[in-house]
Amino acid sequence: MAISLKVLAPNKNVYQGEAEEVILPSTTGQLGILPGHISLVTAIDIGVLRLRMNSQWKSIALMGGFAEIESDEVIVLVNNAEIGSEINVQNAEQDLKEAKLAISKFSENEKNPEKIKALKQVSKAEARIQAAKN
C-alpha cells in the first residue's frame, strides 16, 4: 500500500507521485507518515521532506507552508520548494555564506528585521544543501 503525495508551490507542481513513507519537517518536529496515518493538518517549517519509494529516498527542500494528511493522501502546500537532485549545491553554499555574513553585522541580542530576514535565509540555504546532499 502506498501514500499519494503532492507537493505544490504557488507557481508550480513540485512533486506528484506515490511514496511508501514520508517524513515532513513540521513546526513541532519531524513527522513520519505511513499508510493508514490518522487525518491531520500541520504547519510545515523550513526544512527537508524525505520520501521513500522502492527502498530509495528522495529529498525535497521546503520553505514553509501546510500539509494535510487524509486517507493515504498527503498534500503539501508550500511557499516554495526544490527537489534535492535539482539543487545546485555551490549556489546554496554561497547563499549560506552570504546570509551568515549578513547576520554577523548585527549584535547577538539585536532584533532587527534585516537580521531576522538573514536568519531565515540561513535556514533556507541549509535546507537546500541538506536536500541536495541526501
Curated annotation (Swiss-Prot):
The keyword Magnesium does not apply. Keywords: ATP synthesis, CF(1), Hydrogen ion transport, Ion transport, Membrane, Thylakoid, Transport. One of its GO terms (molecular function) is ATP binding. InterPro entries: ATP_synth_F1_dsu/esu (IPR001469), ATP_synth_F1_dsu/esu_N (IPR020546), ATPsynth_dsu/esu_N (IPR036771). GO terms for cellular component: plasma membrane-derived thylakoid membrane; proton-transporting ATP synthase complex. Gene3D superfamilies: F0F1 ATP synthase delta/epsilon subunit, N-terminal. It is a peripheral membrane protein. It is found in: Cellular thylakoid membrane. F-type ATPases have 2 components, CF(1) - the catalytic core - and CF(0) - the membrane proton channel. CF(1) has five subunits: alpha(3), beta(3), gamma(1), delta(1), epsilon(1). CF(0) has three main subunits: a, b and c. Produces ATP from ADP in the presence of a proton gradient across the membrane. Belongs to the ATPase epsilon chain family. This is ATP synthase epsilon chain. It comes from Prochlorococcus marinus (strain MIT 9215). The lineage of its organism: Bacteria, Bacillati, Cyanobacteriota, Cyanophyceae, Synechococcales. The gene is atpC.
